[in-house]
Amino acid sequence: MAGKVRNIVVEELVRTPVEMQKVELVERKGIGHPDSIADGIAEAVSRALSREYVKRYGIILHHNTDQVEVVGGRAYPQFGGGEVIKPIYILLSGRAVEMVDREFFPVHEIALKAAKDYLRKAVRHLDLEHHVIIDSRIGQGSVDLVGVFNKAKKNPIPLANDTSFGVGYAPLSETEKIVLETEKYLNSDEFKKKYPAVGEDIKVMGLRKGDEIDLTIAAAIVDSEVDNPDDYMAVKEAIYEAAKGIVESHTERPTNIYVNTADDPKEGIYYITVTGTSAEAGDDGSVGRGNRVNGLITPNRHMSMEAAAGKNPVSHVGKIYNILSMLIANDIAEQVEGVEEVYVRILSQIGKPIDEPLVASVQIIPKKGYSIDVLQKPAYEIADEWLANITKIQKMILEDKVNVF
């Protein structure tokens, strides 16, 4: 496997590094955002099915559960505690093998349990009995296990199920780190213990204009945890101070932090929710409409439009190549001296082994004083090593060592 000659192209990228561009935009949709809920459920279902397939049959059977729709409900929030009038509707769809050698495999049971388990962790104030309806319409499939094993023996490296590409880059910019870590901290167990009123639907938008950063945070506040507007304003202040701490640990640039800017106290308008997610109030969510595999939405960077969440971790290059591109880029940025920025794009060809992409493009912006000539060989070797060991990604996914949104 290591002896293969792969089509890896390492070249210099001539463009202004993101940190030197005048305007940079960065977004993260928090785990309670409707789009992130869809991503999280889709991925939780895929991982649960994969683990159960391995447990029963020793191999991950074919499935894709990347079609999850969150249909917003209707709620009446009020200080001290409101109510959900119309529950959120969540549709699980896609495909999964349900018959194995005439033996029934409980796809829907596993999928529903995985979805509920995920929601319990992701949206703490969501009452699964009254606030949400989960409907599994995952399509059925059947398989001859002997045929599956014979195919796996013949092709130890899975064959790409699509002609598609993945994209990754490194390192993160200052603004990207701030946006990512602000949401992660506000949704951390540590912060929630101190401020249980802060819901999980937290969206962070970063704008850097020159050397000044604007950080806009929209955070759903749980109505049962705040009795009045004064309580609400105290929680907003806590969010502001927490974000300020993150910002100050990452940059010396002047930064403006804004929290829940749509509030209008004079009109009695506050961002309060019953559940901690705007999905209760008609906001819908879909897989792939939110964060990329590095957890961010970054219009200043190359991005793939593929939805990674819910795709099978064996042969679906829409998932595997996006993760792989990110890992290769991270290693090149960390291990190769003289790299200012690196962008990785990997293209598959349907039916070909996933360790032999049609092309693996590595584009490097060298640091001042460094030539691309001295960066090409180590960058090539890192990309080649990851491709030679591409099946490790499947294991990393099942062990929850990589995220996809």
Swiss-Prot record:
Signal sequence, start to end? none
Q: Which GO terms describe its molecular function?
A: ATP binding; magnesium ion binding; methionine adenosyltransferase activity
Chain positions recorded as ATP binding sites: G139, Q140, G141, S142, V143, D144
Which cofactors are reported in the record for this sequence? Answer: Mg(2+)
Q: Which GO terms describe its biological process?
A: one-carbon metabolic process; S-adenosylmethionine biosynthetic process
Q: In which pathway does it act?
A: Amino-acid biosynthesis; S-adenosyl-L-methionine biosynthesis; S-adenosyl-L-methionine from L-methionine: step 1/1
Keywords assigned: ATP-binding, Magnesium, Nucleotide-binding, One-carbon metabolism, Transferase
Quote the catalytic activity from the record.
L-methionine + ATP + H2O = S-adenosyl-L-methionine + phosphate + diphosphate
Its top-level enzyme class, in one word, is transferase
| EC number assigned by the record | 2.5.1.6
Entry's Gene3D superfamilies? 3.30.300.10, S-adenosylmethionine synthetase, C-terminal domain
| PANTHER family per UniProt | S-ADENOSYLMETHIONINE SYNTHASE (PTHR36697:SF1)
- Family designation: Belongs to the AdoMet synthase 2 family.
What does it do? Catalyzes the formation of S-adenosylmethionine from methionine and ATP.
What name goes with this protein? S-adenosylmethionine synthase
Q: Which source organism?
A: Thermococcus kodakarensis (strain ATCC BAA-918 / JCM 12380 / KOD1)
* Gene name in the database record: mat
